[in-house]
């Protein structure tokens, strides 16, 4: 899998200081072309009080990171819970262009997924505006290191927050009682819609995939990200799966079966 666009195609070059680190503004400028907004649309079926069935359209927002490209697709990493149960998925890129995407692969145990956007659907302007993120090494993180989070907070579009590495190898129990793998803890603001977005070091490299926050009135500044060193081998496997595109109604198959209630006469006949 190769890069979607060079840094010079996507953004003006920014130079690091003598320490080899960028400012927060420089990290944002360099890396926002690698981060996308994801919208998950579905129809929820609910049984009402009288035994009938009601259908309600549902829409949720998340984030994603451009992690690769093959001959025909731009590949975007995100959280599994961002795309789970979707009827349709759309991806908004840095130039605000929106394209339909398909799930390429998911790993629910690690809350990771890859979605694919067909290059043939995309304009030249969009392709020139984006780039594949640079991958860092989350195994080398130090507590107190500054980081930048980019994501689609509250579905409003891309926003940037900054903070510090608060802890590493943090295991968290979710509301279902499931204990996560070892996560990066940061006080950079991680809000609904940030899931699947990028946690970056000050060299502009991806070090984590934002996935959760502690939500309670007495809690502040406790966000969590999947370390990229954990995520990368899983994403590599998902990226190399075959994308299964949904057929439209004109090409959808059918099994030719009609269902009937079985009465006593039918039972005796068959």
Question: For each of these PLM feature ranges, what is it?
Answer:
Residues 2-268:
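Serine-dependent protease modules
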């Amino acid at each position: 899998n190769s890069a979607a666009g060079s840094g010079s195609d996507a953004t003006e070059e920014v130079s690091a200081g003598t320490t080899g680190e960028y400012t927060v503004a420089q990290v944002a400028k360099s890396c926002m072309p690698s981060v996308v907004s994801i919208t998950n649309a579905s129809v929820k079926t609910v049984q009402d009080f009288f035994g009938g069935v009601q259908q309600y359209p549902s829409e949720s927002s998340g984030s994603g990171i451009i992690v690769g490209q093959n001959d025909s697709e731009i590949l975007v990493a995100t959280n599994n819970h961002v795309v789970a149960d979707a009827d349709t998925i759309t991806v908004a890129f840095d130039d605000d262009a929106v394209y339909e995407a398909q799930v390429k692969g998911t790993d629910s145990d690690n809350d990771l997924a890859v979605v694919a956007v067909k290059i043939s659907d995309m304009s030249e302007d969009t392709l020139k505006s984006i780039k594949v993120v640079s991958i860092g090494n989350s195994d080398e993180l130090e507590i107190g290191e500054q980081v930048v989070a980019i994501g689609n907070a509250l579905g409003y579009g891309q926003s940037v927050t900054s903070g510090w590495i608060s802890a590493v190898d943090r295991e968290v129990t979710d509301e279902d009682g499931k204990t996560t793998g070892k996560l990066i803890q940061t006080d950079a603001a991680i809000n609904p819609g940030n899931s699947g977005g990028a946690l970056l070091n000050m060299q502009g490299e991806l070090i984590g995939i934002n996935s959760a926050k502690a939500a309670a009135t007495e809690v502040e500044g406790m966000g969590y990200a999947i370390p990229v060193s954990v995520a990368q081998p899983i994403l590599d496997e998902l990226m190399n799966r075959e994308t299964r595109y949904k057929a439209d109604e004109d090409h959808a198959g059918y099994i030719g079966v009609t269902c009937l209630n079985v009465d006593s006469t039918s039972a005796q006949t068959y």
